[in-house]
Amino acid sequence: MALPNLWGLYNLRSSPFFQATLRADSQTTPLHLFVGRQRERQLLLTTIGSSTSSRQAVAGRPGIGKTTLVQTVKADAQTEGYWSSDEIIPISARGAGAEGTSAHLLGQLLSGVYDAVLANCPTAAGPEVEAGQQLVRSIRLRGGGFTVSAFGFGAGGSQSESVATPPGALLLEGPRVLRDLLRYTIGQGARGIVLHLNNLENLSEADASRAADLLRGIRDQALLHDGLHLIVVGTTDAVRTVVQTHTQVRSVFSNPLVLEPLGLADVEQLLANRYEALQLDQSRPWHSPVETAVVVRLYELFRGDLRGMLKALEDGITALLGLTSAGAEVAPVGLEDLLLTLLQRNQAELQEQLGDTAWERLLAWAQVDAAAVQTQAQLVELWQVKQPSVSQTLQQLIEAGAVEALPRRGREAIQYLMTGTARLAF
């Protein structure tokens, strides 16, 4: 007996409100669902195509589609003869151990290049590939990751698979091995390798400064090799800190490309593309699970935060469809029903997550104006508490997804705004 599929009521195989990153190798979240951003897409591709080596940065608020844009750019570049892979390389800046060193970041870049070589040329062989395999295997074994066989990757973890590579070998040999792998790539007819560095979304200010130091530490060793094209992705403040703090790094990076939210028409097209791709019965039309007014209102509340908007649609519609019995087709969910469901749900979740004090302060903010921008000085006056208490509460609200800090403007005070998730609770 098949399990019930609530989305089948709209002739859809599964939820169209997924948040998974679009990938070239995925049948459920394929890249052809990407919409909009043609200008930004062309700018990134032109920079890659106009140089033997490039370093770019894509910035913007959380949830507006930065990662998906870069995944699409990598796929575009691949059709033009560049090598890449769907993997995203994280920049880690926390801790005083291996993960907080330039050597670790160098190892991640080397692993990314090696993965791209194997992804595009599974039969790759030769001294350059063997040297890369040995270093990458050593890196992954020390980090508790995967081992590498002569024919690719495996999930083994035994000591017999280990390679005796001294910890300092990465700093000594890594840059040479990286350069040789890139030369091998060019020798195989590729125009270069495009790597996607991510994980700047949630870096604290201190972590972003540390990441800037790490990037500076490998500038000459790794960033400037012919054939290597890097795209760093993260929030506006994090990206600016990471790539513009040090002159040595800023001088070799293009100015960050700061993304604005997708327009409403593009968001509506994005949803239509998903409905069509998930059509269950090709002999019958699909139906939108929500009325147009729902999309318009949530777009206004979330101000272009697609991640938050899709989650709100998923949560609200799933709750409402759970009350629907299988049978005849159901009408799209209306605005009033969805907003009421999300208000009750978000209120309960935030109250439980925040506790009484932080919830009461968020409520006081909402009673003044849930859409208003606030500074810490304004919140000191509103909440009638001292600045350290305001700072602590804001951190709690940010971690709960109720508030976000807007990008800095020079030396002006940081501005804070309620997220769509919090505004739905009021």
Where are each of the predicted segments found?
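Winged-helix-like regulatory helical subdomains adjacent to P-loop NTPase cores
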Residues: 304, 308-378
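Conserved AAA+ ATPase small/helical "lid" subdomain
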Residues: 130-138, 275-329
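The catalytic "switch" region of P-loop NTPases
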Residues: 2-12, 176, 180-295
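A short, basic N-terminal segment
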Residues: 1-56, 76-79
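Short, cationic-aromatic polyanion-contact patches
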Residues: 408-426
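Short amphipathic alpha-helical interaction segments
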Residues: 384-400, 413
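P-loop NTPase nucleotide-binding core
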Residues: 46-193, 197, 203-206, 228, ...
